[in-house]
UniProtKB/Swiss-Prot annotation:
Few gyrases are as efficient as E.coli at forming negative supercoils. Not all organisms have 2 type II topoisomerases; in organisms with a single type II topoisomerase this enzyme also has to decatenate newly replicated chromosomes. The gene is gyrB. PANTHER family: DNA GYRASE SUBUNIT B, MITOCHONDRIAL, DNA GYRASE/TOPOISOMERASE SUBUNIT B. The keyword Lipid metabolism does not apply. This is DNA gyrase subunit B. It catalyses: ATP-dependent breakage, passage and rejoining of double-stranded DNA. It holds the Pfam family Toprim. Its cofactor is Mg(2+); Mn(2+); Ca(2+). It is an enzyme of class 5 (isomerase). Heterotetramer, composed of two GyrA and two GyrB chains. In the heterotetramer, GyrA contains the active site tyrosine that forms a transient covalent intermediate with DNA, while GyrB binds cofactors and catalyzes ATP hydrolysis. GO terms for cellular component: chromosome; cytoplasm. Disulfide bonds: none annotated. Binds two Mg(2+) per subunit. The magnesium ions form salt bridges with both the protein and the DNA. Can also accept other divalent metal cations, such as Mn(2+) or Ca(2+). It is found in: Cytoplasm.
């Protein structure tokens, strides 16, 4: 480090260097994924601004297989003409110059989410490569950038009738710790945008996974958003309160809200379509007006006298779902990430609009107003009961030694960052865990039976539950609006350790519901983990090994089977062994797994037989006779193998749109007939290509006299599948496999070695990427309404791989 501090020490970061040097200032954290996804939102916000101005109706966001993302819209297209001052195309100025854009010229956009003119130029600076395509003036313009540097000027590459812009970018691994996009995070934001912009179609597709896509298009704006958020809950009044008011100063305030019979408060705030996670002046104005208007109404109508308990703002917001959306010509945020609105004029705008409109709503809808007031009074009484219960607990706690529950085996470490709390199912596993742990930093809390489902329980009832009270005391961070302080948490690693069966899953879900509803910050801060104890223990001779799950078990058995295996495809052929044989086995197993996954849509036997017939492709489908012959062969092989069970017959269907002939197979089982069309999508899919590749690899491989050998043992075979089955059976000789169902089956040493030793254990961190989706899932699975839960189970039942009953 130099001691010279003079004028030469002062660096001026020109162009996009500032962004690369301090990316966090522009897009948020580059390590935890928020900054990475913010890149997509910066580009999407530009398309939304086109929609706000009335020029864009369709936005398509695609996560490509190579983990790049493209955002395409049908807006006006970025201007392509030469910029009068910069002497390069306007598009290049927008892509490479900070604080350049159409948001400063008040005539181009009245209100916009883009504010500082840094959005797309930041994306360009922090991407390894950007491909810009503009459709404008009847021409297609294209330009490529590497790390923000244009490789050539904007060039015309074709003609078109459409207008719009497509930006495809590959994030830079030099900036981001992790460059993998999460579908749920993008889906959450795009869903919000589609509600906030009625009639705009937003499509999201993930090419990394089969059939993963969503189409968000909602009429009804934020009113529909509130209905969507409450759809699995029970609203206490039918009508969604909604107003949209535009003021003379250009600020427009739109609010939609509805109370449900739950106990959670859900308020979503937006400024110019951009969400404010930390609220701001619009939230303050909304809360103030809500409490004041409701209190005035309750005093006037005599509800306050009946209540016999003073109501607070928190009571008024219990069970409230609301969306507050403001449009502000020149908004001020606390940072470029726009997480908090600080424009002071917005608070009074929201307050005055809410006061007036909510008072009118309550006066015009007396029965709905009565329901809301009754709920607020109930909340106030419950809060009072909870306060008394807490005081009782505190008085009782003063008598206990250090106020910690007797069940808790605490650790010696006092630094929360180094301490771990294992929440263990049942006293027997708790005993093993207490004996096996490292006392220095591992505490154990055994929970007896199932804790209360907090989704259905009121706060005072929850506090009276013994298991919940024990858990709250052990955590040390308090609970409830007045007492809860996540900074007082005694352990920064809370590990849920339950059995690998139905009861274990249920207890884990109940605990996650508790943390999500009562202490969400613990999940947001990454303190909650789920232990992943092994499912199997295998023993061969004196060697023991723990195996985490079914997939690892299959891999272990295949590796064992390959040891010393030789495949002779005929009596005289040289042996196929080692890596070539292993690759073929892996290819076969991957295909079988694919068949199992696809068997939700087609019969397993039919898919499996595709491995043993030649490839069918688009070329073959143009010839009807060829398709008939191919289908006939498939059907004959199926009928020969499935004697008596099912009868297969041939049909061929002509697809007029594509002008191709497609195989259609009729299956008759126990007198019931079903038809299955092998569609053009299936024939052209990556999945079918993998089955066809295996078909070509196995075609003619096994000849007369073929045999498989492992060590000294030899077995004649007629198919590759028979060879693999024999090898697996052989490898199991002398192998003892134990499947663990409960943690209590392990002794303390085994529990330490497999689940508690930081060197060898596996844990899964609990995170929330899509808060709306998570809220919906907890409500569906753990709430009062049966119908949404039944629909969820019926929809997802076929996707279950292992059902433990």
């Amino acid at each position: 480090m130099s001691n010279n501090y003079d004028s030469s020490s002062i660096k001026v970061l020109k162009g996009l260097d500032a962004v690369r040097k301090r990316p966090g200032m522009y897009i948020g954290d580059t390590d935890d994924g928020t900054g990475l996804h913010h890149m997509v939102f910066e580009v999407v916000d530009n398309s939304i601004d086109e929609a706000l101005a009335g020029y864009c109706k369709d936005i398509v966001v695609t996560i490509h297989e190579d983990n790049s993302v493209s955002v395409s819209d049908d807006g006006r297209g970025i201007p392509t003409e030469m910029h009068p001052e910069e002497k390069v195309s306007a598009a290049e100025v927008i892509m490479t110059v900070l604080h350049a854009g159409g948001k400063f010229d008040d005539n181009s956009y009245k209100v916009s989410g883009g504010l500082h003119g840094v959005g797309v130029s930041v994306v360009n600076a922090l991407s390894e490569k950007v491909l810009l395509t503009i459709y404008r003036g009847g021409k297609i313009h294209s330009q490529t950038y590497h790390h923000g540097v244009p490789q050539a000027p904007l060039a015309v590459v074709g003609e078109t009738e459409r207008t719009g812009t497509t930006v495809r970018f590959w994030p830079s691994a030099q900036t981001f710790t992790n460059i993998e996009f999460h579908y749920d995070i993008l889906a959450k934001r795009l869903r919000e945008l589609s509600f906030l912009n009625s009639g705009v179609s937003i499509k999201l597709t993930d090419e990394r996974e089969e059939d993963k896509k969503d189409h968000f298009m909602y009429e009804g704006g934020i009113q529909a958003f509130v209905t969507h958020l409450n759809r699995n809950k029970t609203p206490i009044h039918e009508k969604v309160f909604h107003f949209n008011q535009e003021r003379e100063d250009g600020i427009s305030v739109e609010v939609a809200m509805q109370w449900n019979d739950g106990f959670q408060e859900n308020i979503y705030c937006f400024t110019n379509n951009i969400p404010q996670r930390d609220g701001g002046t619009h939230l303050a104005g909304f809360r103030g007006a809500l409490t004041r208007t409701l209190n005035n109404y309750m005093d006037k109508e005599g509800f306050s006298k009946k209540a016999q308990a003073a109501t607070s703002g928190d009571d008024a917001r219990e069970g409230l779902t609301a969306v507050v959306s403001v449009k502000v010509p020149d908004p001020k945020f606390s940072s470029q990430t726009k997480d908090k609105l600080v424009s002071s004029e917005v608070k009074s705008a929201v307050e005055s609009a809410m006061n007036e409109k909510l008072a009118d709503f309550l006066a015009e809808n007396p029965s709905e107003a009565k329901n809301v007031c009754s709920k607020i009074i109930d909340a106030a009484r419950a809060r009072e009961a909870a306060r008394k219960a807490r005081e009782m607990t505190r008085r009782k706690g003063a008598l206990d030694l250090a106020g910690l529950p007797g069940k808790l085996a605490d650790c010696q470490e006092k630094d929360p960052a180094l301490s771990e709390l294992y929440i263990v199912e049942g006293d027997s596993a708790g005993g093993s865990a207490k004996q096996g742990r490292n006392r220095k930093n591992q505490a154990i809390l055994p929970l007896k039976g199932k804790i209360l489902n907090v989704e259905k329980a009121r706060f005072d009832k929850m506090l009276s539950s013994q298991e919940v009270a024990t858990l709250i005391t052990a955590l040390g961070c308090g609970i409830g609006r007045d007492e809860y302080n996540p900074d007082k948490l005694r352990y920064h690693n809370i590990i849920i350790m339950t059995d690998a069966d139905v009861d274990g899953s249920h207890i884990r879900t109940l605990l996650l519901t508790f943390f999500y509803r009562q202490m969400p910050e613990l999940i947001e801060r990454g303190y909650i983990y789920i232990a992943q104890p092994p499912l199997y223990k295998v023993k061969k001779g004196k060697q023991e090994q723990y195996i985490k799950d079914e997939e690892a078990m299959n891999q272990y058995q295949v590796a064992l089977a390959m040891d010393g295996a030789e495949l002779h495809v005929n009596a005289d052929a040289p042996a196929l062994a080692g890596e070539p044989l292993e690759k073929l086995v892996q290819q076969y197993n991957a295909a079988i797994k694919l068949v199992e996954r696809m068997s939700r849509r087609y019969p397993y036997a039919m898919l499996h037989e595709l491995i043993y017939v030649p490839r069918i492709n688009a070329e073959l489908c143009a010839d009807k006779a060829a398709v008939e012959a191919w289908t006939q062969r498939l059907v004959e092989q199926l009928n020969a193998k499935e004697v008596g069970a099912s009868q297969y017959s041939v049909l061929v269907e002509h697809n007029a749109e594509l002008n191709v002939y497609l195989p259609k197979i009729q299956v008759r089982t126990h007198g019931v007939t079903h038809e299955y069309l092998l569609s053009a999508d299936l024939i052209n899919s990556k999945e079918y290509a993998k089955l066809a590749d295996l078909s070509e690899a196995l075609d003619g491989l096994i000849e007369a006299g073929a045999f498989i050998k492992r060590g000294e043992r030899v077995q004649p075979i007629s198919s590759f599948a028979a060879a693999l089955d024999w090898l697996i059976k052989e490898s199991r000789r002398g192998l003892s496999i134990q499947r663990y169902k409960g943690l209590g089956e392990m002794n303390p040493d085994q529990l330490w070695e497999t689940t508690m030793d930081p060197e060898t254990r596996r844990m899964m961190q609990v995170t929330i990427e899509d808060a709306v989706g998570a809220d919906e899932l907890f409500t569906t699975l753990m709430g009062d309404q049966v119908e949404p839960r039944r629909a969820f189970i019926e929809t997802n039942a076929l996707k279950v791989a292992n059902l433990d009953v």
